[in-house]
């Protein structure tokens, strides 16, 4: 493997199309403000580097990005790249990952609006992410131990598994398909409207008007805090521990909780015939 070490690059396409190369301790910044410094690379290991230029890693194949920093000026850092590992790296630029395939993210700190759009086969573990519109229209995502904050998350995704995570969000999972969330906290209003095939297992759900207009919705051993006007027009099978503030116009299926503050049937635009019961009724 070739070695490029302790250099400073600021020109356009400075390391364009390098192959089988280790790039170590380099700085990508300067007056020339060049774009696309590592475009079209193959089999490249990038470690202990800092970036302050736009569009650095586009159309890369079989790359590793480790122990590096990409600041706010590093816009759209990784686009159209395949088979990548991003590890122990800080990413701060907008639109950091887009239309990439087969990406592994480990132990990273990411603050990037519009992160992960239209990606396929992404794995994230032990990371912190702040992002508006994360993973829009992405597919085949696996997440474990993620601390996430941001609005409009995981909309239009297809094929998502989340475990052991804390999601502080709003309008999450809208129009999503085939999503499973396990042992996680999901906080935020208007959760998962218009979703299909969403399963929540041992989760804590916090926020107003969750889980409306859903198809094939399942809640297994979940808690619901500050959840009013829940399940409107949803096809749902829900087993909830504790209290639900209110349930409104559930379309079909079954909802069971320890207690329900209010069951509302009014102003319905369709037949709503879901079975709603408390645990005491079930035990009789």
Question: Whereabouts are the PLM-identified features?
Answer:
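Long, distal/terminal scaffolding or interaction modules
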Residues: 1-284
């Amino acid at each position: 493997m070739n070695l490029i070490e302790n250099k400073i690059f600021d020109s356009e396409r400075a390391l364009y199309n390098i192959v089988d190369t280790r790039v170590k301790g380099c700085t990508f910044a300067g007056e020339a403000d060049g774009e696309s410094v590592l475009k079209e690379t193959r089999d490249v290991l990038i470690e202990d580097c800092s970036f302050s230029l736009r569009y650095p890693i586009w159309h890369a194949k079989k790359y590793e990005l480790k122990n590096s920093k990409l600041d706010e000026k590093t816009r759209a850092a990784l686009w159209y790249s395949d088979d990548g590992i991003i590890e122990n790296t800080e990413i701060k630029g907008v639109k950091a990952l887009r239309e990439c395939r087969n990406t592994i993210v480990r132990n990273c700190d990411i603050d990037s609006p519009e992160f992960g759009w239209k990606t396929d086969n992404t794995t994230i573990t032990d990371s912190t992410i702040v992002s508006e519109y994360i993973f829009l229209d992405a597919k085949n995502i696996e997440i474990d131990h993620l601390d996430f904050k941001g609005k409009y998350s995981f909309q239009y995704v297809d094929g998502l598994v989340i475990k052991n995570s804390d999601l502080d969000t709003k309008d999450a999972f809208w129009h999503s398909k085939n999503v499973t969330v396990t042992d996680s906290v999901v906080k935020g209003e208007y959760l998962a409207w218009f979703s299909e095939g969403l399963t929540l297992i041992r989760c804590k759900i916090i926020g107003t008007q969750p889980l409306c207009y859903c198809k094939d919705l399942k809640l297994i051993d979940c808690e619901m805090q500050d959840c009013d006007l829940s399940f409107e027009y949803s096809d749902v099978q829900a087993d909830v521990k504790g209290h639900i503030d209110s349930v409104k116009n559930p379309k079909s299926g079954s909802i069971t909780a320890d207690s329900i503050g209010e069951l509302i049937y009014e102003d319905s635009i369709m037949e709503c015939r879901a079975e709603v019961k408390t645990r005491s009724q079930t035990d009789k």
